[in-house]
Amino acid sequence: MMRILLFLATNLAVVLIASITLSLFGFNGFMAANGVDLNLSQLLVFCAVFGFAGSLFSLFISKWMAKMSTGTQIITQPRTRHEQWLLQTVEQLSREAGIKMPEVGIFPAYEANAFATGWNKNDALVAVSQGLLERFKEDEVRAVLAHEIGHVANGDMVTLALIQGVVNTFVMFFARIIGNFVDKVIFKNEEGQGMAYYIATIFAELVLGILASAIVMWFSRKREFRADDAGARLAGTGAMINALQRLRAEQGLPVHMPDTLNAFGINGGIKQGFARMFMSHPPLEERIDALRRRG
């Protein structure tokens, strides 16, 4: 909770500074001179409220959504040796990472994958695919689990949700400025907000939203390297490298993980060219090289 409060305080300061900066550069005067009467400070606060509300709401329901979207079955009473080992391993890794034991689950998927989610590092969920348990060696599965525990211990779910809140705020803010400019300056509408405002605002939100998602994914890729480093500390560098090499060998298999969980999975798939900007994970080769340099 302290992380959320500190981050919100920081971003309120960012909103305030942005508002002051726009005023100092005469942006209000420029808009008014062109017939656009906007209170930028009020607009910025309005966008911040709605931008963060959606992001934080998604964070708070993330465990429930993950269970529903993947069909994850939570292990309460282990019925097999695999389930018993899984619970014991997660408990041990959590203790070493200094967090409370998360919920542990298995989701039905052939591809080797895993994810972690939850609004709080002491109220999280770690789940692995059936395919991962069946085909990977125990030390490789342990490394994957250590990677996911690393996400939880590092507070990555909260961090990315708050970063998403920031970009949501500015996407909404600038989209509405563009919408007003198009409506009042280009189409010369003087009676409220015309159709041009709504069309331009929606179009601007789509374009700016795509650009903003590249920023969020950049942060996500940086967090993956940190989670790999945590996995190497908890399970051993060799085991972490072996797990990533096994994942690389299976990259041809289709990924059935929902896009909303990809940022916190172990395997984010492959994209080429311009689409690489929107990858939630760095290429596996880069992650393996980073671990080798770690030694």
Curated annotation (Swiss-Prot):
Q: What is the superkingdom listed in this entry's lineage?
A: Bacteria
The name under which this protein is listed is: Protease HtpX
What EC number(s) would the UniProt record show? Answer: 3.4.24.-
What does the entry give for GO biological process? proteolysis
Q: Which residues bind Zn(2+)?
A: 147, 151, 224
Write out the entry's keywords from A to Z.
Answer: Cell inner membrane, Cell membrane, Hydrolase, Membrane, Metal-binding, Metalloprotease, Protease, Transmembrane, Transmembrane helix, Zinc
Q: How is the cofactor bound?
A: Binds 1 zinc ion per subunit.
Disulphide connectivity of cysteines: none
Name the membrane topology term. Multi-pass membrane protein
Q: Which Pfam families match?
A: Peptidase_M48 (PF01435)
Organism listed in the record: Pseudomonas fluorescens (strain Pf0-1)
Residues in the active site? 148
